[in-house]
Regions:
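Long, low-complexity, intrinsically disordered segments
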Residues: 224-234
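Active-site-proximal alpha-helical scaffolds that flank and shape metal-associated catalytic sites
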Residues: 66-166, 198, 202
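Acidic, carboxylate-rich catalytic segments that either coordinate divalent cations
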Residues: 192-221, 234
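Long amphipathic all-alpha helical oligomerization modules
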Residues: 167-197
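Alpha-helical bundle segments that constitute or directly flank the non-heme di-iron/ferroxidase center
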Residues: 10-15, 30-59, 78-79, 129-139, ...
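Hydrophobic alpha-helical segments
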Residues: 1-5, 114-117, 206-209
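Short, charged/polar, low-complexity loop and linker segments
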Residues: 21-27, 115-117, 180-187
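Acidic, low-complexity proline/glycine-rich segments
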Residues: 1-22, 165-176
Length: 234
């Protein structure tokens, strides 16, 4: 199921994992100011991303799913958010200012509303499909960059965080859980999950565009509002 979802969204997926900003991070040539702006938005994004995973746990059908999702949430709360805060400090930013007065830009806000809505109103598989492109794409974009880490330690450390074996193992757990929960989906279920996955992947591209200072592009398909066939949870 997870591989089918990724293959159905190949153009957006390729745009996310090979974005010009990602390539500049790998080369160590991205201006620090640009990377700082990325972290200012990503910290806000990750807080709601963690909330979305918490909502998905509430829909988990069994203890095995709760176990996998709890590790996923723990990685975000205990590793990734603190790392983003530390990166922001290294780049001269103020995490305290983000906590006090940080404001989501439109793409960040729209993306997180999609995650929270789908995770609250949909099934466990729906919610997991929504949050998966973020986790999975970061592992995939970092893996090839591990072969030649940039000289700049900020960029090298960021790549290593997502290119490590531990992160890859976590992604494998998450994709395996989705494969189990979704099972052999019928055409209607496959269309719904594909829609959710595609929306999240397009938002990943838009987030990179926003951080890089580019127009967001078409991003979300005009259908908008709910997956094909029915709204999640209805």
């Amino acid at each position: 199921m997870s591989l089918d979802l990724r293959e159905r969204g190949t153009p957006a997926w390729a745009a996310a994992v090979s974005h010009p900003m990602v390539r500049q991070i790998g080369a160590g040539t991205l201006p620090h100011e640009t990377f700082r702006g990325y972290f200012e938005q990503n910290i806000l994004y990750l807080e709601d991303y963690a909330r979305a995973i918490g909502l998905i746990i509430g829909h988990a059908p069994d203890v095995e799913a709760i176990d996998v999702l709890s590790r996923f949430l723990q990685q975000i709360v205990s590793t990734e958010i603190p790392a983003n805060v530390a990166f922001l400090r290294r780049l001269g930013g103020s995490p305290a200012a983000i906590s006090a007065t940080g404001t989501m830009l439109p793409v960040t806000y729209s993306y997180t509303r999609h995650l929270l809505y789908t995770s609250a109103q949909g099934s466990c598989a729906d919610g997991l499909t929504a949050v998966l492109p973020c986790q999975w794409s970061y592992g995939e974009l970092a893996t090839p960059l591990m072969a030649a880490l940039p000289d700049d330690p900020v960029y090298a450390d960021w790549v290593a965080m997502f290119g490590s074996g531990g992160y890859s193992a976590l992604v494998a757990e998450t994709t395996a859980l989705l494969d189990r929960l979704a099972g052999p989906a019928d055409a209607a279920a496959m269309a719904r999950l594909s829609w959710i996955f595609d929306i999240s992947t397009r938002y990943e591209v838009q987030f990179w565009d926003m951080a890089y200072g580019e127009p967001a592009g078409d991003g979300v398909p005009a259908a908008g509002g709910a997956p094909p066939g029915k709204e999640p949870g209805r």
